[in-house]
Amino acid sequence: INTITFDAGNATINKYATFMESLRNEAKDPSLKCYGIPMLPNTNSTIKYLLVKLQGASLKTITLMLRRNNLYVMGYSDPYDNKCRYHIFNDIKGTEYSDVENTLCPSSNPRVAKPINYNGLYPTLEKKAGVTSRNEVQLGIQILSSDIGKISGQGSFTEKIEAKFLLVAIQMVSEAARFKYIENQVKTNFNRDFSPNDKVLDLEENWGKISTAIHNSKNGALPKPLELKNADGTKWIVLRVDEIKPDVGLLNYVNGTCQAT
């Protein structure tokens, strides 16, 4: 498994763009494309996981583990007390659990578990972060960098601090890889913190639906109008692939052939 690294403590817009490109290239199925948009592999791919190593200020690091077929964050590790400390969401079970444990922290090295006692779904993370919506949790390179420092190597931290970090990391890594619109929000607001707007939240919640609609399009027209949201929360009706294509970085895997590659 290749590790993609991003130094948030020493970042530029170009470095973030390169990180996004590397992540999409590692994740995508090289043989699948739909209307020019790369697609993630199905669950049978040989390489099932991806590692993303994030570095914050003063060389603190956290490594995220992603499921390759949907970019879902399964857990993370950090160096703690000269050991590899791994943190796995409580909805990861069975063989996947041991895969995450052994990939984040190979058994040849001393390791210690610090479980995440909740799942990785947005409503859960929002509740643990003490917010009613994740639009209350600001995103930004500086925030990502300082959040890494609040967890990496620390003897203790609250669930609130952890959930906030996870909300920031999931959106700035996985969601930004899925959606160029979200990547561009990070780039536009690069030197300041920002709240994710209504379009960001809506895209995040409709990635599967958007992927299926694009995949099932005929001659560039969606099977039926897709009702999404603009940045200001107003209704955005999408009729054609071209209208949403600039916002999409990766499609979720959809079975069957796509009319246009």
Swiss-Prot record:
Q: Which UniProt keywords apply?
A: Antiviral defense, Disulfide bond, Hydrolase, Plant defense, Protein synthesis inhibitor, Toxin
- Active-site feature positions: E175
Q: What processes does the entry annotate via GO biological process terms?
A: defense response to virus; negative regulation of translation
- Disulfide bonds, paired cysteine numbers: C34-C258, C84-C105
Recorded hits in SUPFAM superfamilies, A to Z, give:
Ribosome inactivating proteins (RIP)
Tell me which EC number(s) this protein carries.
Answer: 3.2.2.22
Q: Name one GO molecular function term.
A: toxin activity
**Pfam families per record:** RIP
> Which major enzyme category is it?
hydrolase
PROSITE patterns with a match to the protein in the record: SHIGA_RICIN
Q: Which reaction does it catalyse?
A: Endohydrolysis of the N-glycosidic bond at one specific adenosine on the 28S rRNA
Which family does the entry's similarity section mention?
A: Belongs to the ribosome-inactivating protein family. Type 1 RIP subfamily.
Concerning PANTHER family, the annotation shows: PTHR33453, RIBOSOME-INACTIVATING PROTEIN (PTHR33453:SF34)
Function in brief: Inhibits viral infection of plants, and protein synthesis in vitro.
Q: What is this protein called?
A: Antiviral protein S
Q: Which organism is it from?
A: Phytolacca americana
